[in-house]
Amino acid sequence: MENKQKTATTVKVSPGPLGYVYARRLPPEGLTELALLSARSADSDTAVLPLIAGLTVESGFDVNVAVVVGSRTTGVGGTGVSLKLMPSHYAPSAYVFHGGRHLAPSSAAPNLSLLCDRARVQFGFSSFKPKPCEAEGETTGEALCEHLGLNPNESLLYMVIAEGFKEAVYISNTILHMGGVGTVTIAGEEVRRIPIYPLQMFMPDYCRAVADPFNDRHRAIGEYFAYPLPFFNAKLASLLFGAAVGPAAVALRARNVDAVARAAAHLAFDENHEGAALPADITFTAFDPTGSKAGHRNPRECGGGFEQRLASVMAGDAALALESIMSMAVFEEPPTDIGTWPMLTCQESTAARAASIGAYLGRAAGLVGAMVFSSNSALHLTEVDDAGPADPKDPTKPSFYRFFLVPGTYVAANPQLDRDGRVVAGHEGRPIVPIVGGNHEFTCEHLATLCGFSPELLAKMLYYLERCDGGVILGRPEMDTFKYVSDSAHTDVPCCLCSLDNRHSCAHTTLLRLRARHPKFTSTTRGAIGIFGVMNSAYSDCDVLGNYASFSAIKRMDVQETARAIMQETYRSAVERVMAELENLNYIDAAVPTSPAKLESIITGREALQTVVSNVKQVVDGEVAQLMRALVEGRGFRFREALGEANHAMSLTLDPHASVPCPLLQMLGRRSNLAVYQDLALSQCHGVFEGQAVEGRNFRSQFQPVLRRRVLDMFNNGFLSARTLTVALTDGACISAPGLVSGQHAAAESGFEGDVARVNLGFPKEIRVKSRVLFAGAGPAASEAARARIAGLQSAYQKSDKRVDILLGPLGFMLKQFHATLFPNGKPPGSDNPNPQWFWTALQRNQLPARLLSREDISLIAFVKRFSVEYGAGNFVNLPPNNISELAMYYMANQILKYCDHSTYFINTLTALIAGSRRPPNAQAAAAWAPRGGTELEAQARSVVANPGDHPGAWTTMFASCNLLRPVMATRPMVVLGLSISKYYGMAGNDRVFQAGNLANLLGGKNACPLLIFDRTRKFVIACPRAGFVCAAVSAGSGAHESSLCEQLRAIIAEGGATVASDVFAAAAKSLGARVQQLQIEDWLALLEDEYLSEEMMELAGRALERGGGEWSLDAALDVAREAEAMVTRHVDAEETFDFGAFAEDGPADAGLAVHLQSRRRPLACSDLFGDAPAEKRNDLTLDML
């Protein structure tokens, strides 16, 4: 990844308040949409809303603002006062503190507030406790409604606040300017809004948080200033304590949540603060990373070393400082406007709009499930471990990887230690649970911790988990919710949150249903971080060969040429030309390049298939030859060497408004960013500690600025792409604010002078993620550990010489889809249905009667075999094509690899697991949404399934895989992926630290996503498209390996044979039982990645139901499977059979007419089906070849 120099850009922003309190009557329309997008617990009157133009704020709302953060004395003797402005942006969430009960709760789970309070106590986090003076001076929602002339029982009050100043509202450092009430229009309704300003306005030159805001005699108050009443609302403060401060406190390991809020507020007001912000008495968790002697070791032995604890707090402090810098960022993209959402533009009724939103949130549930159940998710990486010095012989030698994040979810209840490793008061006698080993159980309290102990975010988390699959698609036993609820009426249930009537929707029941997917931590070694991010650009280098022959790589510095001319000779443009030509040939649909629908009208016979394949081959060969000639002759491009530097690459934005409008998804993005910031900071800690007396009391305050500067110096060094802005006020800007003498109830004054405190602003803009295309092996300078690790990978990347089944080869997808058209006589004896598995298995085993083949059949077989053998000999993509687009892209990549003399190893490939949604397939899936439980649960759940239109949120998540990642990335999706950040110095003598964000995989396998498989040559990205839904479409490790049903079925397919369909169905029936009848065609596609087999599975399932008289029976299913097997294995009389093995690969088609008598014998293994392959040719590249 090339290093881009910082460029300064001038942006102009308008001055404005810290935020607004919006007061509105309940909207007559859109309340259901608002409820679906919000996060609200059933036992709370508060909620968190997404900031959406046209729904929660007015259309045209500008998120970038120069907020008033204080005042300064000016003039001779300090007699004048000007306002201090700070660039910022409004937070992507709005906070409802009155009237939230009018919004339908995100989940019907009961007593979530009680659960969060209980979890806080269990894990040692502080609770919300307002001060007596705050309670006395509280501004209630009812009082505000009365002041504005609104009915308190029919009104909604919520706050929109600038990022970085939420904590200031929590600690009562703001005021409501009651004299500045204005009116705006939202969705055709008039809405009142009250500006929010800081108390520091009335304290000139006071650039820090006010510890006692209700003290109207504070000595910092300006002379003759009318000190206002600080804004405190108990419901709002409690909401911010959980939803805004709580997630940060958990991520930073700070048990004192109030102290985190005050530290963040101080950083917001004091832009020059560079020292420590977190308190000196912060505590640390004792944990045993090895898992030995769990529960019996001395807590001081499990607290790690002093430097480990110091690195933990200093990295947390640095991450908080980075987040404060990000709060001052100015972003280009405006907030999303619900009126422009493509998925709503064609919906006329309110119910249809709500159903579209519900369907989209059902998609996002797949990503939330991956973040919760992946064992290396940023949500779980909350503790810091020490790997020790890199060189045991030289402990002072700095290492970027000494300190790293480890999962802390299951050790959160361990004893807390002080700075010196002593157990703090109140934690004596607590057991020490190891990170790995032990009998860990993922409980509701752990889930509350992931949400920062916020009932609102926890309710939204349960909303998504209720839509996740519990393991049906994997063959795992899933809990029968109906039976569980029914039995609980007579048995003891280990849950004090629910009763029989609401047990079906309880958080405990949801986690029990998903028990098979609970995270399991098997290692504490440093590894990848599972993060949630958003692609905000349609551009990515995710073609098969990534950014090979990119614009910057082929540009000649000695020649003046246009950018268009350079771009036309890149690999990317060559790919686009191939795809455009396939579209012109009507082979693919540009909107959905992976769809096989176009070919159905083209392949009407044998010649048509040969024409299609020949045309694809001709188009690709021509483009590759043209590309290589341009690179070699025209540019002198070192095409072989460049292949080793090629990477798949994408960028994830740090713009908080880019997330799909949902408070929980925004929290996932924030937690991911905090994990990344801490990873960077931890890499610099050892260098800061080197040669210093770290035990000194003043060390942290003295060296925290050093660590902060080191982290900031890592910007624009390959991973964190930063942007430098020069901020100025808009021309003719008028600074309006409450009068300092007239007070908060007087009208605003507009005669203020003011200036921007930070004119030059540098902040991270995006993170770059890449994956190397080639497996390079160990270099000569690699360490012994690296060589050993690489040696273990070589076998996974080694290209096998074994021939593959024709149906698993390059043309397999077409041969299966069009078998009935191509070989109408290719059906088992006694059957009327053509069967490709039987036909090609019998053909390759020399068991197919020659009388069944015509001259045209043999000609097509010769063509298929020749192309398959030729493709296989030079194939280095460890994936069979599933459609014509993949065939063209894989063949193109292999041709370029052939020019580059690549051999031996497969290349790395990318796969997108695209989240989708569907209505609940059965009553069990809808149990959590039943209006009534108890004895009526099953009937109510069946009613939800039968009447989906009455339940807009009744959707469940599903997945489909796609091996063409570039069109997926063009939808600017939300993604969940594994990220491993490597750090290294530049050239010799250069102390500049570069980084690379390497794409890795999520740990946890099927727990994270049902379609994840263990394949070292593949990297997976879980994606949920945004373009076409909520934004406009743009034109064109070491986890445990789990053997699941998905892998079993694909192993059966990989083995090949005539009985593939019957074997797959029998295996699925034995594993899933009655759940087979619930699988839809999408489920079979996800399991098998084979459209033909998926349709056959649906047919066999239907026949099994008919055999059982409408009821599912395993015996009937197995009978159907045996009949299908018998149909394709029926023996034929001894006669002449077609000798496929002796069939000439390079000879004329007529050579296949020679047949030989074959005795009945045991079929050969698939690896013996073909003759010897032609020797691989590795000639040097010549102009003649080009």
Curated annotation (Swiss-Prot):
The keyword Zinc-finger applies. A motif (Required for filament formation) lies at residues 839-840. GO terms for biological process: DNA replication. Its main location: host cell. Residues 1160-1186 are annotated as: Required for nuclear localization. A zinc finger (unnamed) spans 495-508. GO terms for cellular component: host cell nucleus. It is found in: Host nucleus. Keywords: DNA replication, DNA-binding, Host nucleus, Metal-binding, Zinc, Zinc-finger. The keyword Isomerase does not apply. GO terms for molecular function: single-stranded DNA binding; zinc ion binding. HAMAP family: HSV_DNBI (MF_04007). Plays several crucial roles in viral infection. Participates in the opening of the viral DNA origin to initiate replication by interacting with the origin-binding protein. May disrupt loops, hairpins and other secondary structures present on ssDNA to reduce and eliminate pausing of viral DNA polymerase at specific sites during elongation. Promotes viral DNA recombination by performing strand-transfer, characterized by the ability to transfer a DNA strand from a linear duplex to a complementary single-stranded DNA circle. Can also catalyze the renaturation of complementary single strands. Belongs to the herpesviridae major DNA-binding protein family. Homooligomers. Forms double-helical filaments necessary for the formation of replication compartments within the host nucleus. Interacts with the origin-binding protein. Interacts with the helicase primase complex; this interaction stimulates primer synthesis activity of the helicase-primase complex. Interacts with the DNA polymerase. Interacts with the alkaline exonuclease; this interaction increases its nuclease processivity. This is Major DNA-binding protein. It comes from Bovine herpesvirus 2 (strain BMV) (BoHV-2).
